[in-house]
Amino acid sequence: MEIVKANLSHLKVFEQYVEKCAQAGMEMYIAAQSDSEALLKKRIGYANGEGLPEGWTPSATYFCIEDGVILGSIRVREGNNDYLEKVIGHIGYETAPDAQGKGIATTMLNWVKLKVIQDTVIVTCDVNNIASRRVIEKAGGEFLNTFYSEQDQYEVRRYRLMTE
């Protein structure tokens, strides 16, 4: 298993990942089913600060890959602003449906903590997502508070995660 920064050479395995995630009902991948390449290019561009929606900061995407299959994806958002600090956090991740419960998210978050982030970051999760809550807490996330996300229409848990 390896964790690598997303690039266009991952297109074929990314298409398979998008399909699996979309079939499982993951919203961000449902819309991308018809054009996985555009989503991959967009994510690669975001890492370089290209094509960012207003208020967004550069965001690098990394894939956890084993035997030519993407098991999970993690995004690390750079910088600080109110939206990152108070709403979505600096890190977002998901695991392929057929790889859930196997420690992939924990592996990715610990890897990012050791290899990518330079400073304290905020990580959030839906209050009902017990698996994500456990992942964050295993990585040393310190619970800060809960809040209602108007954008996502659900209650969110907010954590502080410090580098090693």
Predicted segment positions?
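Conserved acetyl-CoA-binding loop-helix of GNAT-fold acetyltransferases
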Residues: 92-95, 101-114, 134-138
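Conserved catalytic-core motifs of GNAT/GCN5-like acyltransferases
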Residues: 124, 142-157
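GNAT-family acyltransferases
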Residues: 1-90, 115, 152-164
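Loop/helix-junction capping segments adjacent to catalytic residues or to phosphate/diphosphate-binding pockets
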Residues: 11, 85, 102, 130-133
